[in-house]
Design a protein with these regions (language model features):
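Juxtamembrane membrane-insertion context
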Residues: 8, 39, 50-54, 92-96, ...
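Residue-level signal for pocket-adjacent positions within structured domains
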Residues: 13, 46, 105-109, 153, ...
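Alpha-helical structural elements
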Residues: 5-8, 23, 46, 88, ...
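Residue-identity detector for glutamine
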Residues: 4-5, 25, 85, 107, ...
Length: 210
């Protein structure tokens, strides 16, 4: 703490604080209790909680995209699973480390994602898109940030690369159902270069023999 305090500078006129950062890596320890995971059968006969938050700056085509992929669903659970399956199967994974994906989950980023020829994004963007699609169907959903769990007991070391985002839907009286719309990380887009069309050479009439 003393080292961090020595490296902290504050600009009164800019109302900005700047730190030189820690000299070494920081680590944190915590304990938690994992909630019980519910089976789909527990949610099948329960309607999801209604969403009435009123999202602002929603990317265009979110409503129609959700409607297209939930048209045959008979329950809120089936709607959520249908959207999850669509994104997980038809989408491609790519993070901000590549030229195929931009970081963040702003309106512009999600709008470009769904208007492109193929869905390309990371877990944060897929979770955001799924939550917006569920909201358009009146289903209360939230984006959750966390990490993949390995095992049910004991300690585990987590780093930034272990962080993940997924979606949870509220079912009153039962709990929150978990949905992971992110495609597998090895399901990445490929850039296909079309071969140039061959142009036939014009035929040239040969002069008659003398």
């Amino acid at each position: 703490a003393a080292e961090q305090q020595d490296g902290l500078n504050y600009d009164l006129w800019a109302d900005t604080a700047l730190t030189t950062g820690p000299t070494g890596q920081l680590s944190y320890s915590l304990s938690t209790t994992m909630p019980r995971e519910h089976a789909d059968s527990e949610f099948a006969s329960v309607n999801a909680a209604r969403y009435s938050g009123g999202d602002t700056n929603v990317p265009k085509d979110v409503d129609s995209l959700a409607a297209d992929h939930t048209s045959t669903a008979r329950s809120d659970l089936e709607k959520a699973r249908a959207i999850e399956q669509f994104l997980h199967t038809d989408g491609y994974y790519s993070n901000e480390d590549t030229i195929n994906s931009r970081p963040g989950s702003s309106q512009d980023r999600i709008e470009r994602m769904i208007s492109a020829e193929a869905l390309v994004g990371d877990d944060e963007q897929y979770a955001t898109l799924m939550a917006l699609m569920l909201h358009s169907q009146g289903i209360n959903a939230r984006v959750v940030m966390g990490a993949y769990r390995e095992g049910t007991s004991g300690g585990v070391d987590l780093t930034g690369s272990d962080m993940h985002a997924w979606v949870e839907v509220e079912f009153p009286g039962v709990g929150w159902a978990t949905f992971d719309p992110t495609p597998p990380r090895d399901q990445q887009p490929t850039t296909q270069v079309n071969k140039p069309k061959s142009v036939p050479k014009p035929q040239v009439l040969q002069p008659p023999e003398p």
